[in-house]
Amino acid sequence: MSEMTPREIVHELNRHIIGQDNAKRSVAIALRNRWRRMQLEESLRVEVTPKNILMIGPTGVGKTEIARRLAKLANAPFIKVEATKFTEVGYVGKEVESIIRDLTDVAVKLTHQQAMEKVKFRAEELAEERILDALLPPPRDAWGQNEQSEDTSNTRQIFRKKLREGKLDDKEIEINVAAPQMGVEIMAPPGMEEMTNQLQGMFQSLAGNTSKKRKLKIKDAFKALIEEEAAKLVNQDELKEQAIYSVENNGIVFIDEIDKICKRGESSGPDVSREGVQRDLLPLIEGSTVSTKHGMVKTDHILFIASGAFQVAKPSDLIPELQGRLPIRVELEALSSHDFKRILTEPRASLTEQYVALMKTEDVDIEFTEDGITQIAEAAWTVNETTENIGARRLHTVMERLMDEISFDATEKSGTKFVIDAAYVQQRLGEFVEDEDLSRFIL
């Protein structure tokens, strides 16, 4: 779990996302509260429930980007899902409980990676010994036991030195490595996961833990043997317990496009992918127990962050019970031309930086001037105002149109330098920005 302070989290988010300070503060506080809760005594910790968040704002202002960046910062089980993917229980489609199953899978993978990292040094030592045994089989005595001699030991040290220096990487050896497990995917109806897991376990046990002799280059054999030895050093049952504990106490679920499951007006017949999904989300957010292939998972302390543009629907169109379970409301603001200008230059790996790097691969130098960047930002903002406002995503469309000619001719213009100034931007984009019909269909 991340131990970053709210200020540090906001600072890290600022490196990738422009503006939206209120949203950043809310998610930073929510993330820090996960850590604070874990410092409490057990009796009080159980009572402290997460304050779920509802982010409201037009499309393209950074809601999903905040989720993406938060996933990297959290160092905890994190999953982002689209609300529109789910249907009510009993109908064809994914049910909302699969969110927790997927989150548990993420946690198991994360815990497994962390455990493998801890034993990596020991696994490398064991893998090295197995490769040296394949290169220099130890001599055996009359009883078939390994016999160590000074000469053998010296030769082994010479080979060990060469192996560590990478001088033997391309040499081929024949070695026993674990055969890949037979993957059996069984599709089962909702609620039958336990039976599916038992069948999968049965098929895998039939295959057994067989090893197979393979001819590999030493560098490839070394990687395979490290994984094999590390897996032997890790207790899989303990890993599952740790993963479930991590999900229950540190798990974060980000539900995007929640406005798309709001009920719109009066409609007859069952609303299986809208209000039905909202009702199914209630017990999950309030706290329930979900059966997964790794064990039972309680959702009482999982943090839920929901987001939606709410351009057609309103937050009040969500069913009242769900509104009550998302107590923290954050409104994200629409982006101005000044914000667009900052987006083009300030974030790490900004759009302009990406295009400069891409063209550099063709030995073409690109320079964006200050007035050129201002003109690009103005063009994107103007098109958003006159047509549909799609936020920062408009910059991708505008930049592609602007760089179209240079990108196409880059191979023939190797060694050339292009300066993207206001005049060049006006020449390439002027007619599209000024003509509403052209901007509507092309930009």
Curated annotation (Swiss-Prot):
ATP binds at I18, G60, V61, G62, K63, T64, E65, D256, E321, R393. Residues 145-156 have a biased composition (Polar residues). It holds the Pfam family AAA_2. InterPro entries: AAA+_ATPase (IPR003593), ATP-dep_Clp_protease_ClpX (IPR050052), ATPase_AAA_core (IPR003959), Clp_ATPase_C (IPR019489), HslU (IPR004491), P-loop_NTPase (IPR027417). Keywords: ATP-binding, Chaperone, Cytoplasm, Nucleotide-binding. It is found in: Cytoplasm. One of its GO terms (biological process) is proteolysis involved in protein catabolic process. Its main location: cytoplasm. GO terms for molecular function: ATP binding; ATP hydrolysis activity; peptidase activity; proteasome-activating activity. SMART domains: AAA, ClpB_D2-small. Residues 137-156 are annotated as: Disordered. Belongs to the ClpX chaperone family. HslU subfamily. This is ATP-dependent protease ATPase subunit HslU. The lineage of its organism: Bacteria, Pseudomonadati, Pseudomonadota, Gammaproteobacteria, Vibrionales.
